[in-house]
């Protein structure tokens, strides 16, 4: 397959995310709105390029006729690295060495994770995430309001539900025993990835 420009890579990831989360692809209007294009014809040019590059297939004359090309469909087995631990409680220091590689069934995850982290703590139990679980994380630097994220705050890592309020961020635990974390403007904060499923081992 051909290498994509950053813009087309972003459009392809948007298509893949919409299919994974909603069961159907975006329309040309959805793509134009998401990326600020002046018209659907600009979105159509990018879709045509993605199709020619072998990333997607398009059924003509259908409003939502985009689908992932066959080679990009999920493999029967995923090989995912475990990169350490993430705090479900107070943030903990990073632990990013590859601890092990696991062969996993893709059906465990809504989207294919880039890596797994082992949960330490109980602040996310109301979302069904428990101490010792392995959470699948899709690496990306942004997230929507309400998504579960792995975030780095002043060099320490935590898993929480993200609340966006204008230009401010709040990290919400899902256990009433814990208080929300209000991210201050002077703090070093960024999102490392979004939660896409978990594995619980006995």
Swiss-Prot record:
InterPro entries: LexA, LexA-like, LexA/Signal_pep-like_sf, LexA_DNA-bd_dom, LexA_repressor, Peptidase_S24_LexA, Peptidase_S24_S26A/B/C, WH-like_DNA-bd_sf. It holds the Pfam family LexA_DNA_bind. Residues 28-48 bind DNA. This is LexA repressor 2. Represses a number of genes involved in the response to DNA damage (SOS response), including recA and lexA. In the presence of single-stranded DNA, RecA interacts with LexA causing an autocatalytic cleavage which disrupts the DNA-binding part of LexA, leading to derepression of the SOS regulon and eventually DNA repair. Keywords: Autocatalytic cleavage, DNA damage, DNA repair, DNA replication, DNA-binding, Hydrolase, Repressor, SOS response, Transcription, Transcription regulation. Belongs to the peptidase S24 family. PANTHER family: LEXA REPRESSOR, LEXA REPRESSOR-RELATED. The active site is at 123 (for autocatalytic cleavage activity), 160 (for autocatalytic cleavage activity). One of its GO terms (biological process) is proteolysis. Homodimer.
